[in-house]
Amino acid sequence: MKKQCLLLFLTVAVYVSQTEVLSAQVNPYQYSISKTAQGNNGAVASAHPIASMVGVEILKQGGNAFDAAIATQLALAVVYPGAGNIGGGGFLVAHTQKGKTISIDYREKAPAASSRNMYLDEKGNPQMELSQNGHLASGVPGTIAGLFSSHKYGKLPFAKLIQPAIDLAEKGFVITPAEARSLNGSKSAFIKYNTSLPVFVKSAEWRPGDTLIQKELAATLKRIRDFGQKGFYEGETAKLIVEEMKRGKGNISLDDLKNYQAVERPAIAFDYKGYKVIGMPMPSSGGLLMQQMMKMIEDRNIDKLGFHTPASVQLMIEVERRAYADRAEFMGDQDFVKVPVKTLSSQKYLHERMKDFIPGKATPSDVITPGNINPESEETTHLSVADAFGNVVSVTTTLNGGYGSKTVVAGAGFLLNNEMDD
């Protein structure tokens, strides 16, 4: 039997447990950390310990990995507003206890009123700010549709899965130094792109130990609990989204919301040295990129090169350069463009891509300049869940940029994405 390996984007989903696992080197939430964590009956890994604990509790209550992933995502929408969301979108890839491979695409979609030149001025010059911030930057959110699409694989009622997020929004949670810095750093943008001050703005600065309470978000989550997917894409919440769009000349309409559907697509699956690797298909490039890179190195004796040696690093760099060149040229949304997946993933093609690779010969130093070293992004978040039944789920969810468009839906309490810039 082949071992199963689950991949999303370029992130290998490592199934470790709750609050102790953030990073061996970086601890943004000021909690105790450990290099390893173990569990016998399931595990949850996410960007915030509170959200991870929500997922663990769902597992303890008899839920499976799909249930825990849903609850964790909803909790992240409360405790990690910079990336966790209900106003954005995401990808889910999973392997079920019955051996089925699943991928769900619930990324944001362009509103029907969008046009090719909507971000150009009268002279045809791009107006970058319009696609990055404010109402016109937002696509139709897909997160809630994605959660309900994946719920059919769960065991527990949706109301039970969303209740922890409602409680966190209603009662609040204590913010850490990193969260205080993040909110304070975005204060001017929140003021600029909202007609009324959202809950993320205080007259004084946020301080570690402050409690962030989100009553409007709690009310929105209750509508979703009570009315299901229609509690977001129709009714009061949809009305509030469209009213917000009108205030800022955005494009999302009631029809856009009502017509949104998450799409279950065949996952990418390939063999690598005895493992079956499962990845997200287009419009995510992650699965195909991983397939290209792993297949380019499969017939090379990488073990003998050693870990992090100049030879192994050079090989990986050259492999990634070729894969990302293909990404820029050939990959896209297959609803609109034809992506030559079969060719890009064929062994013959990948062998040809590596024919000009020369071990020990790198790009000339005189054309290499120092790069900019940035901290870990706060703009997209990932979570992974494994349960005792044999289900494994990996999710990437995002608003695109940190805090998305910086626009909060007045009366509904959640941030909208700026995915139109992606």
Predicted regions located by residue number:
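Internal maturation/activation junctions in enzymes
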Residues: 195, 299-398, 412, 419
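Glycine-rich phosphate/pyrophosphate-binding beta-alpha loops
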Residues: 278-287, 380-384, 396-407
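Protein kinase glycine-rich loop
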Residues: 292
